[in-house]
């Protein structure tokens, strides 16, 4: 987003020559990140468009997120690279206004898309039956439109406030002269969505964990009922005894006398059922860990990429004595841009349908 750059007019030719290798390295690194972001998001968009199996309202949100991140890669990153390498804005104030507008709107829209996806997943888990009827392409379209409209409303006011200050021709930044404007832009674009995402994904994890445990308990009860066998004990009446209980008893207490118990208790079928139950429990635990890992990656990437930048924005613009170096400011801005590269990876890498679609696209290219 907006970051401060200084002019290199006061530098001597020798100093400029000495700094050339580092500038080339920075230029190549940032250009590589921009190219990767463009390619991966383009791949996600293409996969969703050409693969019929991916034509689902939930994936339309992911496609819209990929479009937003694609715009960041092709309309925001290249100008930022030139600005950083040149250390001054050389493209005029008209293009500066346009670049800042696209930068703020697209980055805000990308963040709000993450909130919309979190809300969509939360409703799909907690209100599956009712939400399945509402989860239509039209509903996804309304959600996407709402996200873009909110992004514009959050992003436009800071652009108007920018013109209240005296901007230099060689700078392309937004000066937050008012605390109100700083709080409005940072809370609207990041802090409120962050709180919403944290709450939703916490509830999603709890709901998913409860669902796994309920399914596991239901399977165990079903196997208990299906595994009951008839036993005879002298002149006593016939009783129903669970085979899984007998197997657990035999493992926990080897001294137990099972000679009087019917031989079917130790039958291979009973042992097979117990083994199957254990495997299901293991699979359920694996799925729970996978869900936790996925949610952790989503939240971790979002917080790591954007939190430092917005903390800097809040602190620097509220505290007049607080300063930050040009290099650190640029680094934090690009750390935020990096989220546009990570998003398509996280939201598709754990989906088998996306994996197959990507493999198909790569094979077609070859």
Swiss-Prot record:
Can you tell me which residues bind serotonin?
103, 107
Those parts of the protein on the Extracellular side are 1-24, 82-96, 160-178, 316-327
Name recorded for this polypeptide: 5-hydroxytryptamine receptor 1F
The keyword Membrane is assigned to this record: yes
Which protein family is named in the record?
Answer: Belongs to the G-protein coupled receptor 1 family.
Location in the cell reads: Cell membrane
Glycan-carrying positions = 5, 10
Q: Give me the Cytoplasmic side stretches, as residue ranges.
A: 50-59, 120-139, 203-291, 351-366
Question: Main role?
Answer: G-protein coupled receptor for 5-hydroxytryptamine (serotonin). Also functions as a receptor for various alkaloids and psychoactive substances. Ligand binding causes a conformation change that triggers signaling via guanine nucleotide-binding proteins (G proteins) and modulates the activity of downstream effectors, such as adenylate cyclase. HTR1F is coupled to G(i)/G(o) G alpha proteins and mediates inhibitory neurotransmission by inhibiting adenylate cyclase activity.
Domain of life (superkingdom): Eukaryota
Q: Where are the transmembrane segments?
A: 25-49, 60-81, 97-119, 140-159, 179-202, 292-315, 328-350
Q: Where is this motif: NPxxY motif?
A: 343-347
Tell me the keywords, alphabetical order: Cell membrane, Disulfide bond, G-protein coupled receptor, Glycoprotein, Membrane, Receptor, Transducer, Transmembrane, Transmembrane helix
Might you name a Gene Ontology BP term for this protein?
A: adenylate cyclase-inhibiting serotonin receptor signaling pathway
* Native organism: Rattus norvegicus
């Amino acid at each position: 987003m907006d970051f401060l750059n200084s002019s290199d007019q006061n530098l001597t030719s020798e100093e400029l020559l000495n700094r050339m290798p580092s500038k080339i390295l920075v230029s190549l690194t940032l250009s590589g990140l921009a190219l990767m972001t463009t390619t991966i998001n383009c791949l996600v968009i293409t996969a969703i468009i050409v693969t019929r199996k991916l034509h689902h309202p939930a994936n339309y949100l992911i496609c819209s997120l990929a479009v937003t991140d694609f715009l960041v890669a092709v309309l925001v990153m290249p100008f930022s690279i030139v600005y950083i390498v040149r250390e001054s804005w050389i493209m005029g104030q008209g293009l500066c206004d346009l670049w800042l507008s696209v930068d703020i709107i697209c980055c805000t829209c990308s963040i709000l898309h993450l909130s919309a996806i979190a809300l969509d997943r939360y409703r799909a888990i907690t209100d599956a039956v009712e939400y399945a009827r509402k989860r239509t392409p039209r509903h996804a379209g309304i959600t996407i439109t709402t996200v873009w409209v909110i992004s514009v409303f959050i992003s436009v006011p800071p652009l108007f406030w920018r013109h209240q200050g005296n901007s230099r021709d060689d700078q392309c930044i937004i000066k937050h002269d008012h605390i109100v404007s700083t709080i409005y832009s940072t809370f609207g674009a990041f802090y409120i969505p962050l709180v919403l995402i944290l709450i939703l994904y916490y509830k999603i994890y709890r709901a998913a964990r409860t669902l796994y445990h309920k399914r596991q308990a239901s399977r165990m009860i079903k196997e208990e009922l299906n595994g009951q066998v008839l036993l005879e004990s002298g002149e006593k009446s016939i009783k129903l005894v669970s085979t899984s209980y007998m197997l657990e008893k035999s493992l926990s207490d080897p001294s137990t006398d099972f000679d009087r118990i019917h031989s079917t208790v130790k039958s291979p079928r009973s042992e097979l059922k117990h083994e199957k139950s254990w495997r299901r429990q293991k699979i359920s635990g694996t799925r729970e860990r996978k869900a936790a890992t996925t949610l952790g990656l989503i939240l971790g990437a979002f917080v790591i990429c954007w939190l430092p930048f917005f903390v800097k924005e809040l602190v620097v613009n509220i505290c007049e004595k607080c300063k930050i170096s040009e290099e650190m400011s640029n680094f934090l801005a690009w750390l935020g841009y990096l989220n546009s590269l990570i998003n398509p990876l996280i939201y598709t890498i754990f989906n088998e349908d996306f994996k197959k679609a990507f493999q198909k696209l790569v094979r077609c290219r070859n």
